[in-house]
Amino acid sequence: MLAIPFRGNGGERERVLEKTLELLRNLYNWEHIELFDSNHPVFNRSASRNRGVFAAVQYGCDVVVVCDADSIPEKEPLWAAIHAAHDGLIHFPFTSVAEYPADRIHELDSTLSAARTLGTGWYPSQGGCWVATPKAWWEAGGMDERIIHWGPEDRAFLAAYRTLLGDSVKHEGMLVCVSHGDRGRQFDPADVRIMEQYEHAFGNRDKMLKVIASRGPVR
């Protein structure tokens, strides 16, 4: 199953999503492709991703790909990650991220070759596209839905799954991340404070489980 967290704003995000979906559909023989919005007053990426994994359980899917609406992996590493995910770890179908300009998205095809020449800001990442069994996702605690905005939720989840499951598995390849105007770069201070709880518990299973168990209501 392919689960995509998404809330539109009537602008550029819809155009990016349309092209992203076109490309993602051709990457794998998906049984289900769905968009998820937890319907919190402020779009909650963590909760929306968790809803996608809940749906995968309901559908009886053995593996779920949770992919952001502006992100596109390459076909070969995606297939490799899906077929390897039964090891109970978190998999990433890429080893580097290429930022791609939204105004050139029409030039992308299934090979993603345009991103190799137009992509900028190449960097490693452990977010954007996760591949896992639903069981592994929940054994790592799922994403903390108290972290509402972009950025700290990935880092908190990283600390949790590395502590509770082990290091992630990265499959050689590129993730194209489409840059768009409403994609913020400033972390919310309240989100950062929650993220730091996970970072302080990193490497200590008992402490990490306590952090997860102590989660309060969504703000």
Task: Give residue ranges: language-model regions.
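Active-site nucleotide-sugar/metal-binding loop of Leloir-type enzymes
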Residues: 47-63
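Short, acidic, metal-binding catalytic loop of nucleotide-sugar glycosyltransferases
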Residues: 9, 14-31
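Hydrophobic targeting segments
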Residues: 1-5, 24, 31-35
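C-terminal catalytic/acceptor-binding lobe
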Residues: 146-219
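A short, glycine-/small-residue-rich helix N-cap motif at loop->alpha-helix starts
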Residues: 40-47, 53, 149-151
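Conserved catalytic core of nucleotide-sugar-dependent glycosyltransferases
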Residues: 74-146
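Ligand-binding pocket scaffold of soluble enzyme catalytic domains
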Residues: 35-39, 75
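Short beta-strand-to-loop acidic/aromatic patch adjacent to the donor-nucleotide binding site
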Residues: 61-72
